[in-house]
């Protein structure tokens, strides 16, 4: 199983190297740990292509029966595998992208036939007009849409943004906000803070947002968002540091020499499956 995963990663990175440079992991040069990728399990690759490429504008790169979609500061990998559930109910409730106009992006989402779920995903006290909500404490408009296989996606308006779309945040659900936030701050060096009313922490390229949820939450592995990925400088030493802190790796550090890539996998204490990479920023 582990060998299959490694061969799969090798194949997808090889093909990805041909993609255009517009959607690279530019933030990877801004610190020793930056965000790298989302990895999705999907039942219909054509539907995922319509969402990630045709609708949101990611740059598609084919590798066998799978796809990768490149956005500024995040690559979205889609593997053909039936997920055990969507993002809701797992430790990663949704992923967020920033766009210059939420209204314009929603028009594309509707035209492509994907669900817009803003009203369903916000508390009754938050006003939703034309499927958009103005969030006063963030001074911006947001909306929620559903990608195939119930991957929940938030759109956050950034009016002055030059790119058509870029990574914005990962929104975690947890039974213990303080503990989860502290773990990501201590482990990855994220800068603690807030985002509006939410507890949060920042890494180059991404905001990590935390919400309390008293429900029983499942880990991400096997679900539609299988794992999240961080790009790490000097990954081998970083893995040794994590091991000394008690982290047990599902896939220990190893190098894929032919690609100049190194990888490792582990699960955080709250159930989120994480891949660490070094070299993904070159693709």
Positions of predicted regions on the chain:
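Vicinal oxygen chelate
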Residues: 22-30, 33-43, 68, 85-172, 194-196, 200, ...
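Short, flexible, solvent-exposed loop/turn segments with mixed acidic/basic and small polar residues
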Residues: 27-29, 82-87, 159-161, 215-219
């Amino acid at each position: 199983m582990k060998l299959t995963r490694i061969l799969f990663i090798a194949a997808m990175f090889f093909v990805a190297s041909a993609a255009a440079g517009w959607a690279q992991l530019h933030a990877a040069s801004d610190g020793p740990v930056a965000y790298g990728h989302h990895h999705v399990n999907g039942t219909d690759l054509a539907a995922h292509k319509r969402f990630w490429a045709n609708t949101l504008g990611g740059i598609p790169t084919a590798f066998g029966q799978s796809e990768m979609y490149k956005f500024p500061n995040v690559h979205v990998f889609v593997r053909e595998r039936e997920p055990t559930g969507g993002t809701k109910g797992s430790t990663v409730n949704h992923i967020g992208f920033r766009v210059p106009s939420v209204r314009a992006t929603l028009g594309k989402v509707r035209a492509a036939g994907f669900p817009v779920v803003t009203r369903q995903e916000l508390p009754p006290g938050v006003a939703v007009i034309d499927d958009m909500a103005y969030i006063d404490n963030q001074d911006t408009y947001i909306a929620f849409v559903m990608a195939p296989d119930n991957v929940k996606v938030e759109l956050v308006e950034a009016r002055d943004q030059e790119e058509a779309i870029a990574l914005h945040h990962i929104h975690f659900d947890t039974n213990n906000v303080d503990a989860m936030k502290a773990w990501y701050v201590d482990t990855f060096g994220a800068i603690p803070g807030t985002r509006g009313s939410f507890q949060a922490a920042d890494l180059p390229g991404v905001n990590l947002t935390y919400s309390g949820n008293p429900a029983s939450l499942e880990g991400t592995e096997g679900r539609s968002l299988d794992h999240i990925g961080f790009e790490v400088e000097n990954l081998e030493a970083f893995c040794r540091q994590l091991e000394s802190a008690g982290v047990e790796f599902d896939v220990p550090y190893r190098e894929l020499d032919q690609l100049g890539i190194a990888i490792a996998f582990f699960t955080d204490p709250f159930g989120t499956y994480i891949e660490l990479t070094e070299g993904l920023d070159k693709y």
